[in-house]
């Protein structure tokens, strides 16, 4: 639908619609020559929703298109085959970091906060289904200093966790999560630490600078109980933790909270300590291993050969470096292993979120979770020193001076999929027209080579959804074909479109 406040945009959209109609008419020339009165609309009506690169269209409902009886030639054709099926779709989400929760709870009025959370998680709105929850401090902490749930003086320890408390989170993190849960009880919470308590580490500090922050040999059992206490205490507050990873980006050398945890040590921790402790406590969150970049995809391959692999539900990946095809490689080796993208942040990611979504789901991800749900205009508050995410943006931007919230390009990119593909949907066959690149943050190429990329799903109700993204510098004309019928569409450079039909 055109925005009356943007007449120029309406004229442009109308022109584009005329082009599509004209192109569709070309398909029917042969039929007209045989005496037909016009294009035969032999297929279902197709809903069209589009977001442009410059946000001149933002989840805009454009005029419907219709399948006609002929398939065009000399165009890229997205042939949808619903007889060939792949992984299930679990949903999309973002992280409720300490910074995000603080901004939502303390910098917005109650009505503004309710509007934002409803817009993000309401089933009639964006319908996000995942919230990633850092266990204590991450690189985005409103306090500006690291903390854990069991802090003691340097040189001391608390192996019985007598001082354990999630009281810090009671101020604003848990209230924000409770509001999310109230909007949609089906939202799933995934939790993991950036660092255990400092006394559990060889450097007796939160950071992992130069890889010095390793888990002490006598801290494996206390760390397992740390997870048990966290899950129980959050559960008592109405937040059921459905999944965990043992460690965010294990081995990444950081000045902010981090832990040097090798594949062997992570496998040992899961198999001998974490999984048994959770079972004894009657807790059954799904455990995901790894939680790091595609670039280090050899590490999950080593992990799945370890006996600990039987204790985990899947592998969590980050988008910042490497090739999305690593997920497909792992699937080919261990098809039962679920795969999710558990972190990706616009600003330092190799490409836009629309490109990530297509690449991730084409390569066997069941879920994609972006990084911060909300940040301020400066991309903070951050946990200094934080040079690793100094250009990060969030799904929502909070203006602390005006106490207002606005939605970023990530919001609309997520909506192009989350509003139309339901949890339990299944990816179905469709071709793509790009190859996937090996990336290195913003210094590398985009996720994929320039061209048309797409992914298709069938919802539990039988409806079909195609998400197409134009990763090129000019508009692309293409066709969508299904069961012998097709329609033609022209997609502007950098734009994303969603097609939905019964």
PLM feature spans:
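N-terminal secretory signal peptides that target proteins for export/translocation
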Residues: 1-15
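Sec-dependent signal peptide recognition
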Residues: 16-24
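C-terminal motif of bacterial Sec signal peptides marking the signal peptidase cleavage site
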Residues: 30-33
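Bacterial lipoprotein signal-peptidase II cleavage site
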Residues: 35-40
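Substrate-binding and catalytic surfaces of secreted/luminal carbohydrate-active proteins
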Residues: 43-80, 189-191, 224-242, 253-502
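N-terminal catalytic cores of secreted or lumenal carbohydrate-active enzymes
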Residues: 57-241
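Short, well-ordered beta-to-alpha junction loops that form the rim of enzyme active sites
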Residues: 136, 192-194, 246-249, 292
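Active-site-proximal beta-alpha loop/turn segments in soluble metabolic enzymes
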Residues: 204-216, 249-262
